[in-house]
Amino acid sequence: MYETKIKAIDLFCGAGGSSFGATKAGVDVVAGFDMWDLAIKTYKANFPKAEVFQTDLQKLTDEEIRQFKSSIGNIDLILASPECTNHSKAKGNAERDEESKMTAFEAVRFARVFRPRWMVIENVTEFESWDKFKDLLENLWELKYFVKKTIINAKNLGVPQSRERLFLLCSLTGKAAEPAAEYVITKPASTIIDNSGKYKFTPLRKPGRAENTIHSAERAISVLGNNTSFLLVYYGSGRKKNKGWQSIEEPLGTITTLDRFAYVTPSENGHVMRMLQPEELKLAMGFTPDFQLDSIPGLTRRDRIKLMGNGVCPPVMTKVVKSLVKNG
């Protein structure tokens, strides 16, 4: 086991899911990098001791990366979550940005300069089918990293969300182990729903409600009965499979950057509904309540949903980092 404090930097840090998880594993995350101003704002609020750099990594010269190295100093770990939208099946048939896909190679450039003992690269599972994926692996091998490829579903590590992601676990020691299988009681979506009355409901069958919404709700009610709450699912690959709804006794479907889950519950005047709110999505990602999101000024509800949808589940990164360090 590594006995000294592990120092890390977080590339494409977003709101800080990877950093939050690594911190829970005992890591000192000393710097975060992202180009979205609102992600930077959120990251700064939650990691006040870290240096935070708003920059487009693809536009950095090698000399500028060396200057970052001089400023930050030696590190032991790089966390990297390159752009994933253009790999994801959630993109559908929309045009793909090939240049954005190349952000994965920025992790290699930073590793070449910083030479950390370990590196974790996280992305959607479709990342593996990218035509440059083999080139990425070869670049890592050239830097003498042993690379372990693993797919982890967050629901299997105690997160109340089904979120499957690919992790590349990289180690210079020739050892890189994925988290050991554990028996974890699956957490249902019901655990993240706020029933305090804080959020406003509207009638399910109010005038103007979309027919597809009503039809999905009726399918759920036909299965569950009139007295059971459920979730409507908008957009995404899981919508068709689940016929537009899901039980709250199952982990939440995958959170994306879209507003895609509505909570429906019976009332004295018939079923009422509301969209899940960012603070609920935060809990469904595995963040603890003390992580700042709604309290940060200048962010719209849409911004907060996007920050969560683009994020990494902290408990997963905690397990990944602990396993990597323990075995390397």
Please describe what each predicted stretch is.
Residues 32-33:
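The conserved SAM/SAH-binding core of class I Rossmann-like methyltransferase domains
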Residues 41-70:
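S-adenosyl-L-methionine
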Residues 63-77, 84-254, 273:
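Class I S-adenosyl-L-methionine
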